[in-house]
Swiss-Prot record:
Protein task: Upon binding a putative inducer it probably interacts with TorS and allows it to play a role in the induction of the torCAD operon for trimethylamine N-oxide reductase.
Lineage, uppermost ranks: Bacteria, Pseudomonadati, Pseudomonadota, Gammaproteobacteria, Enterobacterales
Family as reported in the entry's similarity comment: Belongs to the bacterial solute-binding protein 2 family.
Location within or outside the cell: Periplasm
GO MF: DNA-binding transcription factor activity; transcription cis-regulatory region binding
UniProt entry tagged with the keyword Transport: yes
Keywords: Periplasm, Signal, Transport
Biological process (GO), any one: anaerobic respiration
Signal peptide feature range: 1-18
GO cellular component: periplasmic space
Record's protein name: Periplasmic protein TorT
Organism: Escherichia coli (strain K12)
Length: 342
């Protein structure tokens, strides 16, 4: 087994990995490099995926990866979204819909940090945990980067970028008690410890552009000394828009990538964004479900490597496995046909 490594990746270190190598996570700070292996679906398995929402392009890109993998492997895919975070009852009802459809595996992107009675509800159906951890004992495999790292990497970048200069940071990590918000804050705090980078406040709210914009305006009124906004892609989008109205533009850092954040990088309005390569994660989730259904070995937690993107290196080649193509619309149902499998 390769030596466990503390994840201090930058984009320029990624060539040390093979293009298709994965990371198998042992905890939030240690991983083993794992080679990808070929896969062939033995039949048209029926997979049902649940997302918190598709109003955030993070999940849209993941949806693209899933439907591409479903087409590649010749399996059926049904997708349901809850309309937002903290929608436990909705997602519980959606699992029942998956079962009525005849799903053979559930790919669960939870809208909450826990999912009570999951074992009772799914019975013997395999569950692949998708992006958001719920720490349920019946979940045998998770696809996703530890959210700790998605906060740590931006924090580490800011410390290096500041060159010892004090920075006053507003953190906007997303919804309270969901979506990895707590873990991203913990990662950011760990990265800036001992540096002059200071967290002024933490603003929690759903990943909705109006909610994030209102939160940002409220925080800027309360803390006029804020000069950096670090948070979700939706928060970054709000900060880019708000910056136009300020004498001194806000410095913007995003904990993950979206189409808007990518455009911000290209225009120099976002100085850094982490990417956990969402399209690739969607593909991985489908692959893990197929392996589990076929009795093959699956790792307990795998993900693509994290990319650290800046205006200097944000190009199409580096984001091709991160973002869905322009014009892509959500695919809620993909059904295998003989032609599709060829």
């Amino acid at each position: 087994m390769r030596v466990l490594l503390f994840l201090l990746l930058s984009l320029f270190m990624l060539p040390a990995f093979s293009a298709d190598n994965l990371l198998r996570w042992h905890d939030a700070q240690h991983f083993t490099v794992q080679a990808s292996t070929p896969l062939k679906a033995k039949r048209a398995w029926k997979l049902c995926a649940l997302y918190p929402s598709l109003k955030d392009s993070y999940w849209l890109s993941l949806n693209y990866g899933m439907q591409e993998a479903a087409r590649r492997y010749g399996v059926d895919l049904k997708v349901l979204e809850a309309g937002g975070y903290s929608q436990l009852a909705t997602q519980q009802a959606q699992i029942d819909q998956c079962k009525q459809w005849g799903a053979e595996a559930i790919l669960l992107g939870s809208s909450t940090t826990s999912f009570p009675d999951l074992q009772k509800q799914v019975a013997s159906l395999p569950v692949i945990e998708l992006v958001n951890a719920i720490d349920a004992p019946q979940v045998k495999s998770r696809v996703g980067v530890p959210w700790f790292q998605m906060g740590y990497q931006p924090g580490r970048y800011l410390v290096q970028w500041a060159h010892g200069k004090p920075l006053n940071v507003l953190l906007m990590p997303g919804p309270d008690n969901a979506g990895g918000s707590k873990e991203m804050v913990e990662g950011f705090r760990a990265a800036i410890a001992g540096s002059p980078v200071r967290i002024v406040d933490i603003a929690l709210g759903d990943n909705d552009i109006e909610i994030q914009r209102n939160l940002l305006q409220e925080m800027l009124e309360r803390h006029p000394e804020i000069d950096v906004v670090a948070g979700t892609a939706i928060a970054a989008e709000a900060a880019m828009g708000e910056g136009r109205n300020l004498k001194t533009p806000l410095t913007v850092v995003s904990f993950y990538l979206s189409h808007q954040v990518y455009r911000g990088l290209k225009r120099g309005r976002v100085i850094m964004a982490a990417s956990d390569q969402m399209v690739w994660q969607g593909e991985l989730a489908v692959e893990q479900a197929i392996r589990q259904l076929q009795g093959q070995s699956v790792s307990d937690n795998v993900s693509p490597p994290i990319l650290v993107l800046t205006p200097k290196n944000a190009d199409r080649e580096h984001i091709r496995r991160s973002l869905s193509p322009g014009g892509f619309r959500p695919v809620y149902f993909y059904q295998h046909t003989s032609a599709a499998k060829k």
